[in-house]
A protein has these predicted regions:
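N-terminal active-site wall of soluble small-molecule enzyme domains
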Residues: 1-45, 53, 82-85, 167-235
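Hydrophobic faces of well-ordered beta-strands that scaffold small-molecule active sites
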Residues: 18-20, 44-46, 65-67, 98-101, ...
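Glycine/Thr-rich beta-alpha phosphate-binding loop at enzyme active sites
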Residues: 57-90, 167-174, 248, 258-292, ...
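Glycine-rich phosphate-binding active-site loops on the catalytic face of alpha/beta enzymes
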Residues: 6-29, 66-76, 116-139, 163-175, ...
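Active-site beta-loop-alpha junctions enriched in small/polar residues
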Residues: 1, 23, 49-51, 70-72, ...
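Catalytic cores of alpha/beta
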Residues: 2-13, 49-60, 100-122, 150-161, ...
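C-terminal helical cap(s) of enzyme catalytic domains, especially alpha/beta-barrels
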Residues: 79-88, 114, 126-147, 180-189, ...
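Ordered, small/hydrophobic-rich secondary-structure cores
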Residues: 4, 21, 29-128, 281, ...
Length: 341
């Protein structure tokens, strides 16, 4: 903004705050816009991009200072700018709220900057998403999944807690197994991205269930090999992800190379992988960038697990009161722990 008219116009259209860029405003212009905003009970985000502007913001008494990570000359971004400037703001204006702006796309970036900033201004990366609610969850909490959903009420509990994905287990021997109709009813409980869990199923059966229910991903929990995965890929609707689960005992398993969107590592106890309630040695994870972490996750260890940098956590038995019965208090506690950074 460069003119007080814009402030009044913004308020007319329902804005609660304005962003004032010290890179384009001198002190006199800033004060005029500040006065107009305050007369309308509007907040002000004062944007700085270098040390000089930072000192001006402090001298002007800015209460909320945004650090723009974008170079306005060539439009490149550098998140280290927040790390470089925030300590000076803390020193000179300890009561100011620090906001990191621009170039923020992932939850890991948010976690990395959390010790420097009190909040984040995120625009294009969120607005490009079809589902804004789930997009915000992904960047603030990570792409976490609550598996073993068997009832619409449990889907609602998972969604309310902060989950992005909901897991539906189509494995008959599982204590949390669902059939097609119960899966459909469960999905009616909340607008999660639903993942179907299968184990050595016929490819055509998997594709049929996925297509009919509109699932977002397939999680393979059996001995499915690369040939199986390649065939399944050709049968699934475009955009449906394939996740491969691996049991981890005392060594990291070999991961399939092609057509896998996410690798899920779960604790293996004897011949059983998944649903054991056990935690494996997390030092075996390796590169976490494509990993969903499962196995014995609960409110007690969710915060520590979230620090590992995985794509997301897969919660199940640790947030239940009984197999297939999700506990609202445990879910809320687990996601509070994840959010504690």
């Amino acid at each position: 903004m460069v003119d007080t008219y814009q402030v009044y116009l913004a308020r007319h259209y329902g804005a609660d705050a304005v962003l004032l860029m010290l890179s384009v405003l001198n002190d006199e212009e800033y004060k005029a816009l500040e006065e107009a905003a305050h007369s309308l009970n509007m907040g002000i985000l004062t944007e700085v991009s270098n040390e000089e502007e930072l000192h001006r913001a402090v001298q002007l008494g800015a209460k909320v200072i945004g650090i723009n990570n974008r170079n306005l000359r060539d439009l490149t971004t550098d998140l280290n700018r927040t790390k470089a400037l925030a300590p000076t703001i803390r020193k000179l204006a300890p009561n100011a709220t620090v906001i990191s702006e621009s170039g923020i796309y992932t939850h890991q970036q948010v976690r990395d900057l959390a010790e420097y900033a009190d909040g984040f201004l995120i625009g294009s990366s969120l607005m490009a998403e079809d589902n804004l609610e789930l997009a915000v969850r992904k960047v603030t909490l990570g792409e976490n999944k609550v598996c073993g959903l068997t009832h619409p009420d449990d889907a609602a509990k998972a969604y309310q807690a902060g989950a992005v994905f909901g897991g539906l287990i189509f494995v008959e021997k599982s204590k949390r197994a669902v059939d097609f109709e119960s899966a459909r009813l469960t999905m009616s409980g909340a607008p999660l991205n639903y993942v179907g869990v299968f184990q050595n199923h016929d490819v055509d059966d998997v594709a049929s269930i996925v297509t009919s229910l509109g699932l977002k991903a397939v999680q393979l929990h059996g001995q499915e090999d690369q040939e199986y995965v390649n065939l399944l890929k050709t049968e699934l609707p475009v955009g449906v992800e394939i996740w491969k689960a691996y049991g981890v005992a005392d060594t990291k398993p070999s991961l399939l190379a092609d057509n896998i969107d996410r690798h899920l590592l779960d604790a293996q106890v004897g011949a059983q992988t998944g649903g054991t309630g056990h935690v494996f040695d997390w030092s075996l994870i390796g590169n976490p960038s494509q990993i969903m972490l499962a196995g014995g996750l609960s409110p007690e260890n969710a915060q520590q697990a979230a620090k590992l940098g995985c794509l997301g956590l897969d919660l199940n038995s640790g947030v239940e009161s009984a197999p297939g019965k999700k506990d609202s208090q445990k879910l809320q506690a687990a996601f509070r722990a994840i959010r504690n950074y």
